[in-house]
């Protein structure tokens, strides 16, 4: 069944958007505006590089995040309700990157630190809450529909095309990975797609399992070039944390 695919938002557009949002956050007139922008910077970065649905991000909890040793990155243990996906959970590693403009790890950690200065404790409750009046933290998660409304407003302010939706990050992120040679198996695992046929609708994967420009094929081991290996001890710690209620 064909996917009603959103327009892909690619990395160069993301960089322009995030740079504009960071500039606005620095001169924000209120604490509520500043933390809202900082939250949305983290949200957009995470949506692109994790390639997860806005609904998943809306209900992501602070307790589902682990920080890798020596500031090497973050581990997200996304957990889902009953869905048509391959699994009810997905572990995604966001490794620190050299370029601050496109480093989702830095964007998320900057948001967590900014929230802490506001008196928010993001280790409990939703990671991306609604910002209430006065910059207070609401107990409600930021709804997926509101994420798209905010995204399009940010795009208009930045002078960028505003037809994108939150799904555009998922499409653009997966397409960007395919264009640099990432194997289809890896993209399927990160995105949580159930079958390769779904991946084809997004990234044009071939029936042999290759993606545009890919040097790897199906059957080869999953190893992301952007992810750092975990020690056996830390893997055990991660699994123990991921299984907690």
Which residues make up each language-model segment?
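Extended, non-catalytic subsegments within catalytic or DNA/protein-binding/adaptor domains
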Residues: 1-245
């Amino acid at each position: 069944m064909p996917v009603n695919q959103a327009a892909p938002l690619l990395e160069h557009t993301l960089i322009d958007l995030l740079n504009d949002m960071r500039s606005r956050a620095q001169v924000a007139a209120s604490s509520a505006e500043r933390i809202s922008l900082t939250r949305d910077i983290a949200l957009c970065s995470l949506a692109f590089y994790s390639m997860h649905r806005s609904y998943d991000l809306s209900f992501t909890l602070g307790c589902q995040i682990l920080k890798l040793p020596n500031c090497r990155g973050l581990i997200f243990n996304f957990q889902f309700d009953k869905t048509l996906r391959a699994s009810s959970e997905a572990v995604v590693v966001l490794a620190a990157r050299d370029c601050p403009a496109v480093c989702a790890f830095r964007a998320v950690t900057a948001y967590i630190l900014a929230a802490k200065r506001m008196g928010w404790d993001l280790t409990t409750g939703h990671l991306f809450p609604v910002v209430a009046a006065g910059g207070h933290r609401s107990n409600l998660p930021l709804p997926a529909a509101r994420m798209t409304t905010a995204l399009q407003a940010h795009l208009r302010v930045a002078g960028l095309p505003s037809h994108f939706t939150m799904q555009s990050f998922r499409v653009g992120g997966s397409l960007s990975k395919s264009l640099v040679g990432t194997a289809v198996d890896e993209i399927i695992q990160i995105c949580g797609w159930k079958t390769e046929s779904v991946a084809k609708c997004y990234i044009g994967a071939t029936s042999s399992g290759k993606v545009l420009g890919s040097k790897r094929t199906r059957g080869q081991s999953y190893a992301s070039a952007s992810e750092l290996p975990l020690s056996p001890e830390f893997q055990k710690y991660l699994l123990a944390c991921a299984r907690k209620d």
